[in-house]
Swiss-Prot record:
Induction: By iron deficiency in roots. The record marks C170 as: Transition state stabilizer. It is an enzyme of class 5 (isomerase). GO terms for cellular component: cytoplasm; nucleus. This is Methylthioribose-1-phosphate isomerase. GO terms for biological process: L-methionine salvage from methylthioadenosine. The gene is IDI2.
Length: 367
């Protein structure tokens, strides 16, 4: 199941899950077998799989594999409790991405409701498995819708039907989702429509998701692309080489403040200064209406080794022993620096005259 292309981060068939080890890309394509939720937790925490949509799907499917042949002895209510506790455990693997916690909450509610009328524990597990599998299928369709909406909107906003060049950050493509991608999905749609001149991607230190993963996807799809250093982005904009920046999101607050890979905030400031449009592309599952603003978003901090050693912490030591390290995985871009938010339901624009996002009304109308 999943996106039917040669490049897939998630390979799933009922009872079996394999994840592409993205730490080894682009030099090796190695898949890791995931047999239960513990394997899923480790794969997410260790960044075998990454990207907000992908980790939510991988988490759900890891538990689906675990319960598929589980000889559970207990009542439906006990089975629902078992699933719920496993989901809570999986959410702890990476706390910033709302997709994971949102999916867990929905699945917990589903099994809890099912337990009220279920005759046995097996039926609880069956309902959970089917719901997890639906997440995988729906994600690809949602991403293609994001790509279509984004490509059409950019062409209208930029007043151009060809020769659009964009800059993206981190990895938001097939490797970060079940297939196609969010921000990279918009780039794919622009390319397939014949209007993309070039995609620029940042290296995205310290884990190098841009140089290792996004560049890999762009080359794989034969999309004209250029890799730049993170520190070259402002110079690129100053030279007039890009008309838009498109990034993904791990969590979007009710006011539009957006948590994304560290360095996104820098790009938004540079874009504002140079008059470059700045877009966020993400599914509505990345929106967290319970948070009034980005100030409430929990920012994950990762191992100092990612900065002290080469290859995002996987290689040799390059920094002086004894130096202290601050290594946040994400930052928050304020809504006032964001031009629009592209979703599978359409594009969220700012309302006049106050120039703010009314995300809650958009979601209610889109239901």
């Amino acid at each position: 199941m999943g996106e039917s292309s040669a490049l897939q981060s998630i390979l799933y068939g009922r009872g079996a899950l394999r994840l592409l080890d993205q730490r080894k890309l682009p030099l090796e394509e190695v898949y890791v077998d995931v047999k239960d939720s513990a394997d899923g937790w480790n794969a997410i925490r260790d960044m075998v799989v990454r990207g907000a949509p992908a980790i939510a799907i991988a988490a759900a499917l890891s538990l689906a594999v675990e319960v598929n042949d589980h000889n559970f002895i207990g009542t439906p209510a006990e089975a629902a409790s078992f699933v719920s506790k496993k989901l809570e455990y999986l959410v702890s693997s990476r706390p910033t991405a709302v997709n994971l916690s949102d999916a867990a909450t929905k699945l917990q509610n589903l099994v809890s409701t099912t337990a009220e009328t279920a005759k046995d524990a097996k039926s609880i597990f069956q309902v959970f498995i089917e719901a997890a599998e639906t997440m995988l299928v729906d994600d690809v369709a949602d991403n293609k819708a994001i790509g279509l909406h984004g490509a059409e909107f950019l062409q209208r906003q930029l007043g151009s039907s060809k020769n659009i060049s964009v800059l993206t950050h981190c990895n938001t493509g097939s490797l970060a989702t079940a297939g196609y991608g969010t921000a990279l999905g918009v780039i794919r749609a622009l390319h397939s429509g014949g209007v993309l001149e070039k995609a620029f991607c940042t290296e995205t230190r310290p884990f190098n998701q841009g140089s290792r993963l996004t560049a890999f996807e762009l080359v794989h799809d034969k999309i004209p692309a250029t890799l730049i250093a993170d520190s070259a982005a402002a110079a690129l904009m100053n030279n007039g080489q890009v008309q838009a920046v498109i990034v993904g999101a791990d969590r979007i607050a009710a006011n539009g403040d957006t948590a994304n890979k560290i360095g996104t905030y820098n790009l938004s400031i540079a874009a504002k200064h140079h008059g470059v449009q700045f877009y966020v592309a993400a599914p509505v599952t990345s929106i967290d209406l319970s948070l009034p603003s980005g100030k409430q978003i929990v920012i994950e901090e990762r191992s100092p080794k990612e900065l002290l050693n080469s290859e995002g912490g996987l290689g040799k030591q390059v920094a002086a022993s004894g130096i202290s390290v601050w290594n946040p995985a994400f930052d928050v871009t304020p809504a006032d620096l964001i031009t629009a938010i592209i979703t599978e339901k359409g594009v969220i624009t700012k309302s006049d005259p106050d120039g703010t996002f009314d995300i809650k009304s958009f979601i209610e109308c889109a239901k």
